[in-house]
């Protein structure tokens, strides 16, 4: 068990580091055939050692070539993916289920950083993730092909309802990127767990917004990214959605 857990920790770290490097390139809209870069300032190509962020950690989060400070996601994305991969291994009985959970956790966590850094939930991440979810989510506990279908349909219905409900509050109240993430969560989690995910994310976002308003750190109409809350709800539902739904129903 200890050896397998260590492998999941290492695998999550590598997945997160690769996702970080790919994000750095995607922000510049560089073609897929272009070389992977570790630093956009000095254009230093990514090396195999960059899949483990130890060198940057020893260099205090700076590029080893030009010493410019790297975005904080160089640390938080790999470490977060590593921790989530370990949690998936400890949560699921089957290593295959845990591996699939770790991959989806990486995809979801990546969206947190794109929304915070660029106010964007990019199609180049969300749409391929939908395809992967439609093809692999049946591996996860409690999921079947029908759950994928009905979950996607329910996610689409919830997304449309939220878009319509947000219209009186202006164009930025609920974006199309948020809607697509809900559809992704529906495909990944199934009908019952996507309800859990949306409920948790809505509750958390509402409480967070209330605290910001009460402390006057935000004003009504200020931008607040929904992506991180949707991802939080999705990850909780991925790990414990079935149990939460059963508790609520019973």
What are these regions (language model features)?
Residues 3, 67, 93, 97-100, ...:
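Membrane-interface helix-boundary signature
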Residues 24-33, 90-94, 116, 141-145, ...:
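Transmembrane helix-loop junctions in multipass membrane proteins, especially transporters and channels
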Residues 72-78, 95-102, 214-226:
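Hydrophobic alpha-helical transmembrane segments and immediately flanking/interface helices
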Residues 19, 23, 84-88, 92, ...:
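Alpha-helical membrane-inserting segments
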Residues 1-92, 246:
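N-terminal transmembrane signal-anchor/hairpin module of polytopic inner-membrane proteins
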Residues 177, 210-236:
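Interfacial loop-to-transmembrane junctions
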Residues 8, 97-98, 103-208, 246-250:
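Functional transmembrane core segments of multi-pass inner-membrane proteins
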């Amino acid at each position: 068990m200890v050896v397998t857990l260590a492998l999941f920790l290492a695998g999550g770290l590598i997945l997160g580091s690769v996702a970080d490097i790919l994000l750095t390139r995607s922000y510049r809209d560089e073609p897929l055939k272009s070389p992977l870069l570790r630093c956009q300032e000095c254009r230093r190509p990514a090396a195999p050692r960059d899949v483990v962020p130890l060198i940057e950690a020893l260099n205090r989060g700076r590029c080893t070539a030009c010493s410019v400070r790297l975005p904080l996601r160089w640390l938080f994305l790999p470490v977060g993916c590593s921790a989530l991969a370990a949690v998936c291994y400890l949560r699921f009985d089957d290593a295959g289920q845990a591996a699939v959970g770790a991959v989806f956790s990486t995809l979801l966590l990546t969206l947190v950083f794109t929304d915070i850094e660029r106010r964007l939930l990019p199609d180049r991440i969300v749409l391929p993730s939908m395809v992967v979810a439609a093809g692999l989510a049946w591996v996860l506990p409690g999921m079947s092909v029908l759950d994928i279908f009905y979950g996607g349909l329910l996610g689409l219905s919830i997304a449309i309802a939220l878009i319509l409900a947000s219209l009186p509050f202006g164009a930025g109240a609920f974006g199309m990127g948020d809607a697509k993430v809900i559809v992704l969560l529906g495909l990944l989690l199934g009908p019952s767990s996507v309800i859990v995910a949306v409920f948790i994310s809505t509750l958390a976002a509402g409480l967070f917004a209330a605290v910001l308003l009460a402390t006057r750190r935000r004003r009504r109409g200020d931008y607040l990214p929904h992506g991180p809350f949707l991802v939080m709800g999705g990850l909780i539902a991925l790990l414990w959605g079935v149990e939460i739904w059963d508790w609520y129903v019973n």
